[in-house]
Amino acid sequence: MTLEITGSELIKSKLIDAPERSGVYRMFDVNKQVLYVGKAKNLKKRLTNYIKSNLDNKTLRMIANTCFLEYSITNSEVEALLLEAQLIKKFQPKFNILLKDCKSFPFIKLRLDHDFPQLLKYRGKTLSDGKFFGPFASSAEVNTTLTELQKIFKLRSCTDNYFNSRTRPCLQYEIKRCYAPCVGKINKEDYRDLVTQVKDFLQGRTKELQENLSRKMEELSSQMRFEEAAEIRDRIKALSYVQLKAGVSDVVKDADIIAIVEKNGHYCVEVFLYRAGQACGNIPYFPTSTENSTKEEVLEYFLLQFYQKQHVPAAIIINHEINDKENVIEAIKKINNILQINITVPNKGGKAKLVQNAETNALFSLEQYLKKFAKNQEIMFEIKELFGLSEIPERIEIYDNSHIQGKFAVGVMVVAGKVGFDKKEYRVFNVHAPSLVCHSRESGDPKRLMDSCFRGNGIKNCGGDIKGDDYEMLRQVLTRRLTRLRQEPHKLPSLMIIDGGKGHLGVVKEVMDKFEMNIPFVCMSKGVDRNAGFEQFHVIGKEVFTLDKNLPVMKYLQILRDEAHNFAIKNHRLGRSRAIKISRLDDIEGVGETRKKALLHYFGSYKAVCDATIYELAKVNGINKLLAEMIFNVLHRKN
């Protein structure tokens, strides 16, 4: 494809028809990948800024790579802000300030659609039926709180299927973490009283709760019911301990405390969550592509991206003003379909102290991040020199596979970046029989392979049998990966590392030539006696070489290889385990797909099916007593 004009000349040509209205513009590279999304109060004036002479290096690089430019007119600045945020979220442009690893925060959910409500962890932005408490900064925070609640209040945490199938109390009852309502160890009224206590605690009404419990304890004591009174006493003590450990604020009830700090062009945004006056944890974020950006710009982009995924509290308290606060508030309200939010910057008082504490934590987090970044950059520079790369690598992909004599075969890809492993970019590839691969290669349809086999983390099916052919496995994996890279050229790796030797090197070159790609790659094989520290490196056009096992770069390469190896084994075991489970049910005459689904739906999991008695199995729709006995015998026979 020949482009007539690019860069600043392209922008000049677009200025002729650019309107003096609010809107959003998009810059694309030669592959039509979005480089940058920007908003403007006046599109013509904003685009004019890109042809001035005093531009920073980041902007100059962006303009130099711009081959296409499009813009959309909006009815208002708020609409432009909304559209910009949506497009950034969708395309993740290289030159935009991006908030990475922003998973939705978990909640504690109290189900209210059952006679005996269940406490569980919930993650997701859209809150379904039930009572929700949180959010919490991490799963660890939720799990810790749930454990404490189970110790204190002993509400059930099991699924409905498990609850309905019980004929005797489970282990949770034995270790005093559940009152076993499934088998009638507690009546509905007493259980409902416990549910009310849990609500009071999670909503911050701990003082009233403790007063009520104290009155109840005295009442029980006066009735000579000392054992029950002692249980209430222990509950009061446990509540006091949990409250003290969690940290309670009298200053804010429902708020996010957000502080931004900067050092050497890098930013950290620390978020502290407070709900019902209780601290629910904190988490640091490190926005990318912040070169030559101001605190105001970074914080504005952070808020817009953060609150596309997270629950919006009553108050958002920040440590730095943003330029377009009113429009940002309106955009967040529209994104979340809410009527009111409050963004403030306190100068004194208790809120200012909370912000100062968040800022102190942000500085510490940023210093730790920069130390890790600097150390990683040193290693990346050594890798560049070692393998003769044109630039310091920003993305390294490492490949490995795992199988047992060709069965349950999976290939994996792990990714390392500027500050370590990027786990959301990890991929698992189901490896299928050679006949499928050969057919697809002959038909020249690598997309079919990609569509059917390329997936994210997790096992779709249990893998194929490829007769232990490591080369064929690698050929499949790379075919799928390079097919995907044709669609995602912005994810082209700086280097590929393959766990393998000279033969694997030839396979990689064959696939690269087929796709007419020139990605640098190296094969890393076990050395003498397969001992760590004696690895051999195979590069096209070079003799096989080794490295001193004490060199930092050697240790780093071993870490990369081991991460891929462990990820491959983990997913191979998942596939094998799933296949074995499925095959044991498949061994039972009279149990087809419908009955398998009925069993799993009724009991909730394969393990629960295995734990069920003959009487419990016979309760499932479509399973009579004779078939229940057959299922029980097959699942419990010794191999």
Curated annotation (Swiss-Prot):
Residues 207-242 form the UVR domain. One of its GO terms (cellular component) is excinuclease repair complex. Keywords: Cytoplasm, DNA damage, DNA excision, DNA repair, Excision nuclease, SOS response. Gene3D superfamilies: 5' to 3' exonuclease, C-terminal subdomain (1.10.150.20), GIY-YIG endonuclease (3.40.1440.10), UVR domain (4.10.860.10), UvrC, RNAse H endonuclease domain (3.30.420.340). The keyword Transmembrane does not apply. Its main location: cytoplasm. InterPro entries: GIY-YIG_endonuc (IPR000305), GIY-YIG_endonuc_sf (IPR035901), GIY-YIG_UvrC_Cho (IPR047296), RuvA_2-like (IPR010994), UVR_dom (IPR001943), UVR_dom_sf (IPR036876), UvrABC_protein_C (IPR050066), UvrC (IPR004791). Pfam families: GIY-YIG, HHH_5, UVR, UvrC_RNaseH, UvrC_RNaseH_dom. One of its GO terms (biological process) is nucleotide-excision repair. It comes from the Bacteria. The keyword Nucleus does not apply. It is found in: Cytoplasm. Signal peptide: none annotated. SUPFAM superfamilies: C-terminal UvrC-binding domain of UvrB, GIY-YIG endonuclease, RuvA domain 2-like. GO terms for molecular function: DNA binding; excinuclease ABC activity. Belongs to the UvrC family. The UvrABC repair system catalyzes the recognition and processing of DNA lesions. UvrC both incises the 5' and 3' sides of the lesion. The N-terminal half is responsible for the 3' incision and the C-terminal half is responsible for the 5' incision. PANTHER family: UVRABC SYSTEM PROTEIN C, UVRC/OXIDOREDUCTASE. NCBIfam families: uvrC. This is UvrABC system protein C. The lineage of its organism: Bacteria, Pseudomonadati, Pseudomonadota, Alphaproteobacteria, Rickettsiales.
